[in-house]
């Protein structure tokens, strides 16, 4: 029989109390700054890209992956031409690949798992990697993660089908990285909500032609996996093609909604500024 856990020492209790007080103060500050309404979804026929601004365009077949260097000030548009249920993305700082996208911090720092136009994606060092500058469906998932051989076996009865876990490992290998360099991904076009403490898929929110635009706030190595989300409905593995477009984005301004949407986003951009000045 195990011994009862000892009570925390007084100094430990004081540290816990101080950390909780700081957490509550930060949350209150964030709640006070975050606007009541983020921008509405982008129209599917809106936000056209001028041809002269496009640096690269490529179609990624269903089940496959894509990786590219995206420079600060450029944006990646992912066009879901066939309403594939889920496209996963991961990113590394191109100049210090120990810094990478962090789903947990992205959700925690912004006090929300609703990542949509006006929000940002954080690294594990508190800097902003991507800003979501256009978004037609506003239905994305940073909680569940990408597909694996095990999730494919459960959903489709075949663990050999291509998965995001395997695609990310292949993409990482293109840059000399390994499994330890990959963390949980964000899945776009994946309408997942937490209901009664469990993640659930909400049907009918993704349509052909939906797109999301991610502006790079640092030079990034980016990996994209075109595999269905683990919770995607249906028993047939039929991911359709997507289109990845890298283009020169309009420059960010001081009142950019992604920069000003919350106190946490402002701090993230300030961290970027300090890093870029060094």
Regions found by a protein language model. Give the residues of each.
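Acidic, Ser/Thr/Pro
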Residues: 2-278
């Amino acid at each position: 029989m195990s011994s009862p856990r000892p009570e925390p020492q007084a100094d430990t209790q004081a540290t816990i109390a101080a950390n909780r007080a700081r957490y509550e103060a930060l949350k209150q500050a964030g709640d006070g700054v975050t606007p009541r309404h983020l921008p509405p979804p982008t129209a599917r026929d809106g936000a056209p890209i001028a041809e002269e601004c496009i640096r690269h365009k490529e179609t990624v077949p269903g089940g496959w992956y894509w990786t590219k260097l995206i420079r600060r000030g450029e944006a990646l548009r992912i066009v879901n031409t066939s309403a594939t249920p889920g496209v996963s993305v991961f990113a590394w700082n191109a100049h210090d690949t120990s810094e990478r996208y962090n789903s947990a911090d992205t959700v925690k720092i912004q006090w929300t798992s609703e990542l949509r136009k006006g929000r940002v994606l954080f690294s594990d060092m508190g800097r902003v990697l991507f800003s979501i500058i256009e978004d037609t469906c506003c239905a994305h998932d940073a909680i569940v993660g990408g597909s694996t051989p095990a999730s494919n076996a459960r959903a489709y009865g075949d663990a050999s089908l291509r998965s995001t876990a395997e695609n990310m490992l292949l993409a990482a290998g293109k840059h000399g990285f390994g499994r330890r360099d990959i963390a949980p991904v964000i899945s776009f076009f994946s309408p997942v909500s937490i209901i009664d403490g469990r993640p659930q898929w909400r049907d009918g929110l993704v349509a052909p032609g939906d797109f999301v635009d991610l502006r790079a706030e640092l030079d990034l190595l980016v990996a994209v996996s075109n595999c269905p989300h683990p919770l995607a409905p249906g028993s047939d593995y039929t991911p359709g093609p997507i289109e990845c477009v890298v283009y020169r984005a309009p420059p960010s301004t001081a009142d950019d909604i992604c920069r000003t949407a919350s106190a946490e986003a402002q701090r993230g951009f300030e961290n970027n500024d300090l890093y870029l000045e060094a």
